[in-house]
A protein has these predicted regions:
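Central antiparallel beta-sheet cores of small beta-barrel/beta-sandwich binding domains
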Residues: 27-139, 148-167
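Cleavable N-terminal signal peptides
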Residues: 13-14, 24
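Bacterial N-terminal signal peptides that target proteins for export
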Residues: 1-11
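Intrinsically disordered and other compositionally biased segments
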Residues: 7, 24-26
Length: 167
């Protein structure tokens, strides 16, 4: 066999190996950077109103991993036992380091879109809707998590801050 034939054969083998390696990498599932938040988190929250004293209440936040893509469904339920209730659901999809999705406040019947970024310990997103806009930052490590919501317009409240535990 000629040297040219060996060179072409070797190139074909290398190209084939590269194609197989690329296909194997493409088939590898993408790691979900928010998976460490999955589970049920319980704790206390403080709402700072636009005027008047702060109010404290209990919160339960659950995160369910999505089956169709990297990301989570966040269910946020806060209640002071008397006047304040918040039942919100957020669908979060991760694309690279971006977070997109939709949110819904089930008590006030409002909803909107989600856009933000993955952070080293969670995510920071903007909640945009017709009647409500805010930023939300979630950070969780080990057994501890913090959730902070800052509305763009502080007609009702200026800040909602929760400290949660999973363990």
């Amino acid at each position: 066999m000629s040297k040219m034939y060996h060179a072409v054969a070797a190139l074909g083998v290398l190209t084939g190996c590269g194609f197989i390696a690329t296909e194997m990498q493409a088939a590898t599932p993408v790691a979900d950077p928010l998976l460490h938040l999955a589970g049920r988190w319980v704790g206390n929250a403080v709402m700072t109103p636009s005027s008047g004293p702060q109010s404290s209440f209990k919160c339960v936040v659950t995160y369910l991993p999505r089956k169709d893509a990297p990301g989570l469904q966040q269910n946020l339920r806060c209640d002071d036992g008397a006047n304040f209730k918040l039942h919100a659901a957020t669908q979060l999809q991760v694309e690279g380091n971006k977070v997109i999705g939709r949110w819904q406040d089930k008590i006030n019947d409002i909803d909107g879109t989600v856009d933000g970024n993955v952070t080293p310990t969670g995510f920071e997103i903007r909640l945009d809707g017709r009647f409500f806009q805010a930023t939300m930052a979630v950070a969780g490590e080990g057994c501890d998590q913090s959730v902070r919501v800052l509305p763009q317009k502080s007609e009702v409240f200026r800040e909602l801050a929760a400290t949660l535990k999973k363990c």
